[in-house]
Amino acid sequence: MVDVNRFKSMQITLASPSKVRSWSYGEVKKPETINYRTLKPEREGLFDEVIFGPTKDWECACGKYKRIRYKGIVCDRCGVEVTRAKVRRERMGHIELKAPVSHIWYFKGIPSRMGLTLDMSPRALEEVIYFAAYVVIDPKDTPLEPKSLLTEREYREKLQEYGHGSFVAKMGAEAIQDLLKRVDLAAEIAELKEELKSASGQKRIKAVRRLDVLDAFNKSGNKPEWMVLNILPVIPPDLRPMVQLDGGRFAASDLNDLYRRVINRNNRLARLLELNAPGIIVQNEKRMLQEAVDALIDNGRRGRPITGPGSRPLKSLSHMLKGKQGRFRQNLLGKRVDFSGRSVIAVGPTLKMYQCGVPREMAIELFKPFVMREIVAKEYAGNVKAAKRMVERGDERIWDILEEVIKEHPVLLNRAPTLHRLGIQAFEPVLIDGKALRLHPLVCEAYNADFDGDQMAIHVPLSEEAQAEARLLMLAAEHILNPKDGKPVVTPSQDMVLGNYYLTMEDAGREGEGMIFKDKDEAVMAYRNGYAHLHSRVGIAVDSMPNKPWKDNQRHKIMVTTVGKILFNDIMPEDLPYLQEPNNANLTEGTPDKYFLEPGQDIQEVIDRLDINVPFKKKNLGNIIAETFKRFRTTETSAFLDRLKDLGYYHSTLAGLTVGIADIPVIDNKAEIIDAAHHRVEEINKAFRRGLMTDDDRYVAVTTTWREAKEALEKRLIETQDPKNPIVMMMDSGARGNISNFSQLAGMRGLMAAPNGRIMELPILSNFREGLSVLEMFFSTHGARKGMTDTALKTADSGYLTRRLVDVAQDVIIREDDCGTDRGLLIRAITDGKEVTETLEERLQGRYTRKSVKHPETGEVLIGADQLITEDMARKIVDAGVEEVTIRSVFTCATRHGVCRHCYGINLATGDAVEVGEAVGTIAAQSIGEPGTQLTMRTFHTGGVASNTDITQGLPRIQEIFEARNPKGEAVITEVKGNVVEIEEDASTRTKKVYVQGKTGMGEYVIPFTARMKVEVGDEVNRGAALTEGSIQPKRLLEVRDTLSVETYLLAEVQKVYRSQGVEIGDKHVEVMVRQMLRKVRVMDPGDTDLLPGTLMDISDFTDANKDIVISGGIPATSRPVLMGITKASLETNSFLSAASFQETTRVLTDAAIRGKKDHLLGLKENVIIGKIIPAGTGMARYRNIEPQAMNEIEVIDHTEVSAEAVFTAEAE
């Protein structure tokens, strides 16, 4: 058996007849499966034990030899070898076909490989293969053309004309096989290369395609005639099993039926040939054999599929590989896991950040082997069997053992759908009663979990290594930051926010105002006994909190604060300043001086002078967590988060905030605002009736009026609201709801969208407190339904997008420390018109500089070349007035099959420099795919206004970008760099013409009349600049500009979509994806290389091919970059295993087999498929080939070893 972790690559080729015979353990001659009386396999049948091995371990068919001691003996009575029954999953048989049969993949696939090899059309091939026409194989001295087709009648006429034996013509796959044997690959290739020099158009395309296939045969050593089968392999019987059902009936795999048809027809053909039957009968039988083999290989590819009972098409070998239920996706990429369970989740507010509650009966089942081992070790039972019985009986002693066993043994919790890496995290189990898993409330956001009936799965890591990885890398307390943007993902929500908001409120004139306390305990005692209110402003001695970072002038003084804030600051990490105001200045620079009493000053006087501070909201808590993480990293942060959670829950309970209908305020001047709007609409309609405006203008004016009315109500609502109103507190604190929910409760619901996406002119004037009329209710139902269906569709679309993204980037891994490139990316803030989408500061954080950055005025070097830009450094650069910086970027990284650490920058999930081995491709795909469900689905209809600029937004736009499709509402771009000299309008053709004068000549662009112009006369434009509003077609931009311009454009476009929906994603994730779309080039002129024109290949392979030629003084090849959509890029990957498991399985495998492709197992998917440890993270060779050594001999890993690995994952393997 091959050790899966040792082999280096996997190759797939066409099987020659001798190869199939070498695999086979015997010929299957009969269509029988098993004897229905004895239930034993029939001899020479599809389940024969002589061919495929015994059905029971170490036992021959007749029972003469039983037990392992006869291992390897072949029984002299029944001929069965005594071995394991498992060989029935491995041993193959074969069928000797009495007539050659074509392989449907190679004849029917697009393009038809047989057709290209023989230069025949697929239709002609079909006629020959299915016995509708003769093909001339050897015309000898007759004027017939080789490969020309003759009908039955023409064939007879030609025979009479030229005499018998004067030429050779045949029909069926036999004829095709003869033709394929006659193909002289070398001569044909030379001829085609010659033809390419002069050919153009359709002829050239065909020549390139033929050359591609012939060259593949030539290089791989496959012979073209192997596309026709003379011998058919029979797959092992345990892969096409027969199982007995309860009623004594059998359920068999469809493959058995398909094989049975082939054997029946083959045997009948053999008999007919023996009997010398008439030619037409033999022909018919050969055609039926051909169809039977077609159905076995790919049922339904040609003609109507063969059906089983109930007219259900039978599943052929191809169907076994294809799709979600196929071999690749069902059994190889994901398997069911042992030691796992699932249950409903409930909240566990008392748990620590790294804990989860596991029900006892679940734990005893999951940890059974561990418990049994301990039972035997403690000598409660003599052997494992007895120990097992003890566990099953529920002996009292097992619970104490279980407690010991689970201590320090982390488990993994997973919630489907797992959209990003935070969907699986490790926790330490805590045994609980009941049947639901308990989950810490703060990790809910990462899982997107709530407690309305969600279920989660639990898995137990078994080996020591797996436990160590779970504990060190996956523990929930380590996952504070979100990998997509580096912001904390564990921010408190709902009750926790509300409690802390209530706690930090300030109020004037409450009981106890102006009291002064010596320390926290005294203040709490006063509050508990009713002398001081939580919100009243009091004084406290600064010296009672000696560990806080006070300024020197603040020590030994009295500080004005509230009792609530004393409690709030008590849970903060000691080195954080005392928080009085919810802003960044207080958090980073310390407590403001205005809160401190000067000696002899009256406290009431200071209190009266101070403004009342707003309480701490959800956003402020997020900032505090981020700052804590920045200063103290994970351990202290997770402990702080637990304290924050407990405090929030405690005080939201004490505050007792409830919501009743009386809490919804009534707006005093609602009637006035609505009457004014009615009046305005009436005026607009009057103007329209008089012909002063068009219908479109009227529609826009009416909808704008109602929108403004709604905004006026909203504004009034905010002005008149009571800050102590529970609904206002919920909204203001960020616990639940926003102003739009609030204004629907108290203001008006406003305009609704009609089923066609257009906004209806009639608004809903009522709010939910007043209640809606029947008509208003009816209007609003459409929006509600649309919301539901949109969500359902969006989830599926977003999931499929993630799958394609993961597929295209799964082999991008951090391979080395520094690629040493001299290229960089010039970045500035991303803008959309006047608005800034992403600031320069955000784009700089966590990246390495390519060149040093100087102060624009003083010329002082702010940061050197190749230095990491921290958050503070980025702020310093922006504050200095620098507008653009050249950084190291994934786009310009020179590492093969991955990225280097310097071009990538920091790992957003940890805030530290990225490690070699990090699977950044997968992280990038998840970061872009996970927020996909938050994006909108719709294309906005602006209601007939400027209708041709309906902009695609949200998820459809993201798909459009990543699939490199032509965008809707495409912008016209200029190919000339220069100045816009004239824009003329042509009323007759309803177009505008834009003239751009460049150095080399004038560019003239015709633009539709309705398009909105982006340029004016006199503007200077660069090549590839958009002249009109709209999206640029990236493929067109690639023709006009260079690769880097397209990459920069795509990056900016993706960011615009996400940022407009309020989703932040790190640039580097988009860079990784976009780079994968542009990694191929198309060879234009091969020069002196042996590349073929028109070939699509990796840039690195192309450079290698040219390097050798340039060294030897030849002419290098030229190429042009190609932009591929992510689906196409996934299918064009160098790994055929990865591509086949993605989509179009049969096409990928057909192509790979002809080329004799080798998969070097560089990506993650291909290693998962063959069951090898993945070459990322701790699976990388540099981390696995480590020998334990004495301390003094240890050296740092040499970087040469790393870059060698980057070229090929450890040749040592």
Swiss-Prot record:
Q: Cellular component per GO? A: DNA-directed RNA polymerase complex
Q: Enumerate the residues binding Zn(2+) 1.
A: 60, 62, 75, 78
Q: Which cofactor does it need?
A: Mg(2+); Zn(2+)
Instruction: Give the main EC class.
Output: transferase
Q: Which reaction does it catalyse?
A: RNA(n) + a ribonucleoside 5'-triphosphate = RNA(n+1) + diphosphate
Q: Which CDD domains match?
A: RNAP_beta'_C (cd02655), RNAP_beta'_N (cd01609)
Domain of life of the organism encoding this protein: Bacteria
* Residues that hold Zn(2+) 2 according to the record: 819, 893, 900, 903
A Pfam family (short name) is RNA_pol_Rpb1_2
Name the InterPro entries on file. DNA-dir_RpoC_beta_prime, DNA-dir_RpoC_beta_prime_bact, RNA_pol_asu, RNA_pol_N, RNA_pol_Rpb1_1, RNA_pol_Rpb1_3, RNA_pol_Rpb1_3_sf, RNA_pol_Rpb1_4
Gene Ontology biological-process entries: DNA-templated transcription
Q: Which residues bind Mg(2+)?
A: 450, 452, 454
Which terms in the Gene Ontology molecular function aspect does this entry carry?
A: DNA binding; DNA-directed RNA polymerase activity; magnesium ion binding; zinc ion binding
The record's remark on the cofactor is: Binds 1 Mg(2+) ion per subunit. Binds 2 Zn(2+) ions per subunit.
Q: Which SUPFAM superfamilies match?
A: beta and beta-prime subunits of DNA dependent RNA-polymerase (SSF64484)
Report the EC code(s) recorded for this entry: 2.7.7.6
Q: Which Gene3D superfamilies match?
A: 1.10.132.30, 1.10.150.390, 1.10.1790.20, 1.10.40.90, 2.40.40.20, 2.40.50.100, RNA polymerase II, clamp domain, RNA polymerase Rpb1, domain 3
What the record says about family reads: Belongs to the RNA polymerase beta' chain family.
**What is said about its interaction partners and assembly?**
The RNAP catalytic core consists of 2 alpha, 1 beta, 1 beta' and 1 omega subunit. When a sigma factor is associated with the core the holoenzyme is formed, which can initiate transcription.
Q: What does this protein do?
A: DNA-dependent RNA polymerase catalyzes the transcription of DNA into RNA using the four ribonucleoside triphosphates as substrates.
> This protein is called what?
DNA-directed RNA polymerase subunit beta'
- Species of provenance: Streptococcus pyogenes serotype M1
Source species taxonomy: Bacteria, Bacillati, Bacillota, Bacilli, Lactobacillales
What is the gene called?
Answer: rpoC
